């Protein structure tokens, strides 16, 4: 990396951290445990909320559906979504990260074919009130690094956190492109979406 590139990178990171309206990189970053069947909510907030189920299981109740999360799974609750949290029969421990959407708004990506990828505004919209992520250690580790940096606040931590947020957004984009199915109770719809994604390059005949 030459000097001009290095200065550009540092300048970009500095610009992002200085231009956050809230001046906060996160509002909640912690491990929290809940007793069996303990509930929290219902409530909603502007913040994007990411919970990694470190132990046990839990249920997230939305206005018109409920979604179960087990150990090792991740829930992403989008801004403005009304939700109620309920711990499972053995309780649960979560790694929580909550931050304002404006952080993601500083990152814009292009897809590999050169077109503009989905923006954070469309990705974290009402259509995706809750995103369920399974079997993705990479996303969990990035969330863990963000929480650790915010907790210990070592030198230059703000720059690292901004870069980790960018990595987190890329990994979420990748997950949504490769394996995500919208959370819904209609099994036929899930199968149809899965079929289309597997055969999108082929001609599909609708009957």
Regions found by a protein language model. Give the residues of each.
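Conserved short histidine dyad/triad with adjacent acidic residue
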Residues: 29-45
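Short beta-strand His + acidic residue motifs that chelate non-heme Fe in jelly-roll/DSBH
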Residues: 59-61, 77, 83-89
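Tight coil/turn sites that cap or link beta-strands
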Residues: 36-37, 71-72, 80, 100-102
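Short, conserved beta-strand element in jelly-roll/cupin
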Residues: 44-61, 76
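Short acidic-glycine-tyrosine-enriched beta hairpin
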Residues: 64-78
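Short, Lys/Arg-enriched, Trp-marked, Pro/Gly-tolerant hinge/linker segments that flank
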Residues: 125-135, 150-164, 169-207
């Amino acid at each position: 990396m030459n000097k001009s590139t290095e200065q550009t990178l540092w300048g970009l990171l500095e610009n992002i951290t200085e231009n956050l309206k809230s001046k906060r990189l996160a509002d909640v970053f912690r491990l929290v445990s809940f007793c069996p069947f303990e509930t929290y909510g219902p409530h909603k907030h502007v913040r994007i909320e990411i919970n990694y189920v470190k132990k046990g299981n839990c249920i997230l109740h939305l206005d018109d559906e409920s979604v179960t999360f087990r150990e090792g799974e991740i829930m992403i609750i989008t801004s403005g979504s009304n939700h109620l949290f309920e711990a499972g029969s053995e309780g649960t421990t979560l790694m929580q990260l909550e931050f304002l959407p404006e952080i993601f708004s500083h990152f814009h990506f292009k897809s590999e074919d050169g077109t503009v990828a989905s923006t954070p505004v469309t990705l974290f919209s009402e259509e995706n009130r809750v995103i369920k992520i399974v079997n993705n250690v990479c996303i969990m580790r990035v969330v863990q690094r963000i929480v650790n940096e915010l907790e210990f606040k070592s030198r230059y931590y703000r720059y690292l956190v901004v870069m980790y947020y960018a990595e987190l957004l890329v990994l979420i984009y990748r997950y949504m492109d490769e394996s995500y199915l919208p959370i819904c109770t209609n099994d036929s719809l899930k199968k149809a979406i899965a079929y289309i994604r597997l055969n999108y390059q082929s001609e599909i005949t609708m009957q």
